[in-house]
Amino acid sequence: MTDIINKLQAFADANPQSIAVRHTTDELTYQQLMDESSKLAHRLQGSKKPMILFGHMSPYMIVGMIGAIKAGCGYVPVDTSIPEDRIKMIINKVQPEFVFNTTDESFESLEGEVFTIEDIKTSQDPVIFDSQIKDNDTVYTIFTSGSTGEPKGVQIEYASLVQFTEWMLELNKSGNEQQWLNQAPFSFDLSVMAIYPCLASGGTLNLVDKNMINKPKLLNEMLTATPINIWVSTPSFMEMCLLLPTLNEEQYGSLNEFFFCGEILPHRAAKALVNRFPSATIYNTYGPTEATVAVTSIQITQEILDQYPTLPVGVERPGARLSTTDEGELVIEGQSVSLGYLKNDQKTAEVFNFDDGIRTYHTGDKAKFENGQWFIQGRIDFQIKLNGYRMELEEIETQLRQSEFVKEAIVVPVYKNDKVIHLIGAIVPTTEVTDNAEMTKNIKNDLKSRLPEYMIPRKFEWMEQLPLTSNGKIDRKKIAEVING
């Protein structure tokens, strides 16, 4: 495996003025990225705890990542948009020695020695630093939601990141020194899919401003100003962008590669993208945070669309061996698997196994292997029981999306006394709803040919678009709040 830091330094030495990172009007060249990260690494040197990387989309967040990797301590990205109580939970769990605050704000909850961008810019520390990171060191820890309300810190090993990056570069058909687009916040591991493959191939990482997440017109302006070659995002974010009629190959001929991860890629969205960008390479990938971003991939073509009404997630990558339990739960084994949850032995023991030096992770996803392809069939914890029948909400959503009247759909269970009493479908219709009763009848008639009566939602709520979280995923919680009043 090729060391990522060495690749970055070699490219910076050969192309010092090439742009490494761009966010709106802020840019850093490769030389600046390596110099500034070395100055930060000098300050972190010797630390045995991960550095808290605090902020939002900005080039200096990348400086923080590379600096922490060089120092060998790794980093924990914390987004400023999350609630203060959650920030405190993460800080208390990490107990950091150092915090790199890339914002102009000060936060009382930040503990440890705090560095700012200005501290690094004005530092007299040397701009040369020999990387200290080892293959078995934790390179980053990303906190995900926990069922108890306490976030879980997923620890990823440096060797796992290097292996993932090499795999991404093998998939990449666009070549080196490309313009990459990253939509995901740094606290969401989808960002890893853009950051390291981009920089390891001498590309320019273009960061989508958080204000663009629910405003495709602003993104349109960005794409017009900067010809993007490779787009990394969630399917939900892409679906929102497809509302722009100008998002097509004729308008944006430079866009020749797409990577999707983080959610199921709906057939209709993939079909629209293939139609609009017939020359582009489009990848559907799958993977949990606990297995280093993604463990499978498939190139979506017209042939694949014709063959599969529900898209597969493809075949496993190096470092990931997939299997299922008797109940159909997907299990991942190999180098890609996380080192476990930070300071949470109980939760780690529930889903990880490290016997005989082999790491395995029970994903909680239902899956099947068919015709040489892996298919994700929803979450085990998205199962509900209604009138004695056990069912998968995502199965109902998949069938809804196949209706000619439905563009996007989420199914929300309605509870009474902790019991599901009926289902409501949140629907983005393909046409304006002028007759509520007629549209409801049409959709239900569509479903009756594919689902038993007990799985059909009692009623539907019409939405212009489904709200997204800051990560660009569908915000199920917000939809439920809207529906339940």
Swiss-Prot record:
Keywords, alphabetical: ATP-binding, Cytoplasm, Ligase, Nucleotide-binding
Alphabetized GO MF terms: ATP binding; D-alanine [D-alanyl carrier protein] ligase activity
Known catalytic reactions: holo-[D-alanyl-carrier protein] + D-alanine + ATP = D-alanyl-[D-alanyl-carrier protein] + AMP + diphosphate
Binding-site residues, ATP: T144, S145, N284, T285, Y286, G287, P288, T289, D365, K473
Subcellular location: Cytoplasm
Keyword Transport: no
Chief subcellular location: cytoplasm
GO cellular component: cytoplasm
Pathway(s) annotated for this protein in UniProt: Cell wall biogenesis; lipoteichoic acid biosynthesis
Residue positions binding D-alanine: D189, V293, K473
Broad EC category: ligase
Pfam families: AMP-binding (PF00501), AMP-binding_C (PF13193)
Record-listed E.C. numbers: 6.2.1.54
GO biological process, one term: lipoteichoic acid biosynthetic process
UniProt-listed HAMAP family: DltA
NCBIfam families given in the database record: AA-adenyl-dom (TIGR01733), D-ala-DACP-lig (TIGR01734), PRK04813.1 (NF003417)
Function text: Catalyzes the first step in the D-alanylation of lipoteichoic acid (LTA), the activation of D-alanine and its transfer onto the D-alanyl carrier protein (Dcp) DltC. In an ATP-dependent two-step reaction, forms a high energy D-alanyl-AMP intermediate, followed by transfer of the D-alanyl residue as a thiol ester to the phosphopantheinyl prosthetic group of the Dcp. D-alanylation of LTA plays an important role in modulating the properties of the cell wall in Gram-positive bacteria, influencing the net charge of the cell wall.
Family membership noted in the UniProt record: Belongs to the ATP-dependent AMP-binding enzyme family. DltA subfamily.
Protein's name according to its UniProt entry: D-alanine--D-alanyl carrier protein ligase
Organism: Staphylococcus aureus (strain NCTC 8325 / PS 47)
